[in-house]
C-alpha cells in the first residue's frame, strides 16, 4: 500500500519525546488544556515512538493529560469511540497538522471531545438509572442489614457465586445462596445451568459495560 506517514529516525525519538514531555509539564504557557491535549496527541502520533500501539497510547495520553491539567476529575476520558466514527478524517487531520497547519486538527479534536463527552454522560445516566432500578427491585426482594453491601457487591462484581458473596458479606454459604436465588427470582441476576457451584451474572450491568 501507499506509505502515508514516515516517523522521524529512531535516533531522534528520545529528543522529541523529551521535548514533548517538557511541553506537557509546562503549566505556565497559557494554552487552553483542551487545545494542548490536541497538540500533545498530534505530536505523539508524529513521533511514533513504538513499533505498535502508538494509537492506543496516544489516546490514553489525552485522558492522562486532561486529568493532570484538572480538566477531568478521573483519568477515564477515552476518545476511541468518537474518533472511530470518522477515522479517515482523523488521519487526514493528523497529516495536515504535521505540516504546521493545526487549526483544522484542533477544530476536529474539540468537536470529537464534545461527542465523546456526550457519550460518557449518556453512559453515566444509564448506569445511574440501572442502579436506582436495581435498588428498588432489591428492596422489594430481600430485607436484610446487608442490603447496602449486597447492592455494592452487585455493581463491583457483576459475576459472582455463593462462596464469593459469603466472603464479601461475612455470612454462611447457605445464606449467600438464598440471597442469590432471591436475586435470580427477581430478575436481577441470571444463574448458569449447573446444579451445584452455580455462577450468577448481573446481565444488565454486563450489557451496559459492553456498550461503554
Locations of regions flagged by a protein language model:
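FIC/Doc superfamily catalytic core
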Residues: 1-212
Amino acid at each position: 500500500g501507499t506509505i502515508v506517514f514516515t516517523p522521524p529516525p529512531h535516533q531522534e525519538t528520545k529528543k522529541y519525546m523529551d521535548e514533548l514531555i517538557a511541553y506537557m509539564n509546562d503549566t505556565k504557557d497559557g494554552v487552553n488544556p483542551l487545545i494542548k491535549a490536541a497538540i500533545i496527541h498530534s505530536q505523539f502520533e508524529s513521533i511514533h515512538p513504538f513499533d505498535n500501539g502508538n494509537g492506543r497510547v496516544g489516546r490514553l495520553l489525552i485522558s492522562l493529560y486532561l486529568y493532570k491539567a484538572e480538566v477531568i476529575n478521573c483519568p477515564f476520558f477515552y476518545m476511541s469511540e468518537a474518533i472511530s466514527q470518522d477515522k479517515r478524517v482523523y488521519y487526514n487531520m493528523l497529516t495536515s497538522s504535521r505540516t504546521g497547519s493545526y487549526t483544522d486538527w484542533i477544530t476536529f479534536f474539540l468537536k470529537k471531545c464534545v461527542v465523546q463527552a456526550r457519550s460518557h454522560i449518556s453512559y453515566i445516566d444509564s448506569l445511574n438509572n440501572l442502579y436506582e432500578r436495581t435498588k428498588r427491585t432489591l428492596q422489594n426482594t430481600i430485607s436484610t442489614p446487608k442490603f447496602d453491601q449486597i447492592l455494592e457487591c452487585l455493581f463491583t462484581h457483576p459475576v459472582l457465586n455463593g462462596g464469593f458473596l459469603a466472603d464479601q458479606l461475612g455470612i454462611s454459604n447457605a445464606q449467600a445462596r438464598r440471597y442469590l436465588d432471591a436475586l435470580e427470582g427477581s430478575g436481577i441476576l441470571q444463574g448458569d445451568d449447573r446444579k451445584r457451584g452455580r455462577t450468577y451474572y448481573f446481565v444488565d450491568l454486563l450489557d451496559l459495560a459492553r456498550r461503554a
